[in-house]
């Protein structure tokens, strides 16, 4: 079993923001692979289904970014999941918009959602880093990541490619995964 976590913030004011690319991507995975709609738990939304022969749980923590580790730890502990079977999809301002990197472990690089997860389960899980870039104007990074994409249509094809090919990452074929989405 694998757990795919999409990071973001709940609420309509955060929809289609840079910081919510994790939510956006797990929604696309859910749709592409025909999972049931998400159901609401105390502090997260969850659904499950199959990708090829693998049981997959998708979650969107609804505890706000800074507390994402709480629901992730609950699910990990309940299902006794190995960190090798956890993938966290998150925005990364250090990567240019549309650039993707797959990485296991490492620091949070200042990302509060990752800091929270690290504090509850450690940092040796998989990350799908979705580049959102940095502001080109005088806005702070915090204001930028909480702003909506200026042209979401430019992001949609990449999100769809990730959804279609996520099975390769789950199989451990990160090279094929990256080659098919770039």
From Swiss-Prot:
Active site: 19 (proton acceptor)
Record-listed tRNA binding positions: 14, 64, 66, 112
Enzyme class: hydrolase
Main localization of the protein described in the UniProt heading: cytoplasm
The EC number(s) this enzyme carries: 3.1.1.29
Catalytic activity annotation: an N-acyl-L-alpha-aminoacyl-tRNA + H2O = an N-acyl-L-amino acid + a tRNA + H(+)
Keyword tRNA-binding in record: yes
GO cellular component, one term: cytoplasm
InterPro entries: Pept_tRNA_hydro, Pept_tRNA_hydro_CS, Pept_tRNA_hydro_sf
Subcellular location: Cytoplasm
Family annotation (Pfam families): Pept_tRNA_hydro
Top-level taxon of the source organism: Bacteria
Biological process according to GO: protein quality control for misfolded or incompletely synthesized proteins; rescue of stalled ribosome
Residues with site note (Stabilizes the basic form of H active site to accept a proton): 91
Molecular function in Gene Ontology: peptidyl-tRNA hydrolase activity; tRNA binding
UniProt subunit comment: Monomer.
Function (record text): Hydrolyzes ribosome-free peptidyl-tRNAs (with 1 or more amino acids incorporated), which drop off the ribosome during protein synthesis, or as a result of ribosome stalling.
Name of the featured protein: Peptidyl-tRNA hydrolase
Annotated source species: Wolbachia sp. subsp. Drosophila simulans (strain wRi)
Phylogenetic classification of the source organism: Bacteria, Pseudomonadati, Pseudomonadota, Alphaproteobacteria, Rickettsiales
Gene that this polypeptide is encoded by: pth
């Amino acid at each position: 079993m694998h757990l795919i976590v999409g990071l973001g913030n709940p609420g309509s004011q955060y929809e289609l923001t840079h910081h919510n690319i994790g939510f956006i991507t797990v929604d696309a995975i859910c749709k592409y692979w025909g999972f049931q709609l998400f159901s609401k738990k105390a502090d997260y939304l969850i659904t499950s289904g199959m990708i090829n022969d693998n049981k997959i749980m998708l979650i969107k923590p609804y505890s706000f970014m800074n507390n994402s580790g709480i629901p992730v730890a609950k699910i990990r502990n309940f299902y006794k999941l190995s960190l090798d079977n956890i993938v966290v999809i998150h925005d990364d301002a250090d990567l240019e918009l549309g650039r993707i990197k797959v990485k296991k472990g490492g620091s949070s690089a200042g990302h509060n959602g990752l800091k929270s997860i690290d504090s509850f389960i450690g940092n040796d899980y998989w990350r799908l880093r979705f580049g959102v870039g940095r502001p080109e104007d005088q806005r702070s990074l915090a204001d930028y990541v909480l702003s909506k994409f200026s042209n979401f249509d430019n992001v949609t094809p990449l999100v769809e490619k990730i959804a279609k090919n996520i099975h390769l990452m789950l199989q451990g074929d990160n090279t094929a995964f990256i080659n098919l989405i770039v």
